[in-house]
């Protein structure tokens, strides 16, 4: 059983460039676009997408940070959770929103994010951008923008490491049994 590096820093940058290009092409009115990163790793990805869009397409979209702590359906497991604050640049009514996250797996995080968004207005449209889509959905949720679709077994773990949160850049595919043994 092993840990495999799926993407390195350069490859992650290329995935982000492709995502930024696709988002900018679909949103010609960048002044109405709001990129909302889902805490934790969706936030630095949203800022990176903003910077890439600004560099390649002129006007930078606004960025927000969404905390979904109290909207998750697994609040009872894992002990007490401390919420962060959501920080959104404006009322989302009539805006084009792109939710940004690192990994899409079962769809529970995105479901919670959609529920949390209801407290900030009624966007014209909400789309989803993820760095990695690993499949195995429990909800009918699909990304509109996907950096890479990675085939995994349900028991495997995909970990995205970003310099802003982890001090390094890489995407790892980890065997779950190996991860469990390292926790004992």
Swiss-Prot record:
Organism ancestry: Bacteria, Bacillati, Cyanobacteriota, Cyanophyceae, Synechococcales
Originating gene: pyrR
EC number(s) reported in the record: 2.4.2.9
Record's keyword terms, sorted: Glycosyltransferase, Transcription, Transcription regulation, Transferase
One MF term in the entry's GO annotations: uracil phosphoribosyltransferase activity
Protein name listed in UniProt: Bifunctional protein PyrR
Matching CDD domains: PRTases_typeI
Role of this protein: Regulates the transcription of the pyrimidine nucleotide (pyr) operon in response to exogenous pyrimidines.
Superkingdom of origin: Bacteria
InterPro entries documented for this protein: PRibTrfase_dom, PRTase-like, PyrR, PyrR_bifunctional
Catalytic activity, as annotated: UMP + diphosphate = 5-phospho-alpha-D-ribose 1-diphosphate + uracil
Family: Belongs to the purine/pyrimidine phosphoribosyltransferase family. PyrR subfamily.
Pfam family membership, one: Pribosyltran
UniProt-listed GO biological process terms: regulation of DNA-templated transcription
Motif PRPP-binding location, chain numbering: 97-109
């Amino acid at each position: 059983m092993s840990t495999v590096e799926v993407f390195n820093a350069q490859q992650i940058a290329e995935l982000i460039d492709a995502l930024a290009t696709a988002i900018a092409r679909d949103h010609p009115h960048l002044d109405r676009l709001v990129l909302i990163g889902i805490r934790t790793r969706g936030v630095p990805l949203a800022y990176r997408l903003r910077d890439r869009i600004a560099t390649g397409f002129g006007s930078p979209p606004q960025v927000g940070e969404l905390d979904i702590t109290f909207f998750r359906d697994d609040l009872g497991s894992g002990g007490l959770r401390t919420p962060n604050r959501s920080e959104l640049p404006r009322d989302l009514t009539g805006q084009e929103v792109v939710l940004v996250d690192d990994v899409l797996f079962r769809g529970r995080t995105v479901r919670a994010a959609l529920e949390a968004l209801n407290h900030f207005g009624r966007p014209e449209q909400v789309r989803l951008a993820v760095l990695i889509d690993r499949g195995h959905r429990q909800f009918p949720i699909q990304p509109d923008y996907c950096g890479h679709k990675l085939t995994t077994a349900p028991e495997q773990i995909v970990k995205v490491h970003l310099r802003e949160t982890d001090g390094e850049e890489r995407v790892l595919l980890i065997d779950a049994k190996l991860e469990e043994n390292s926790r004992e």
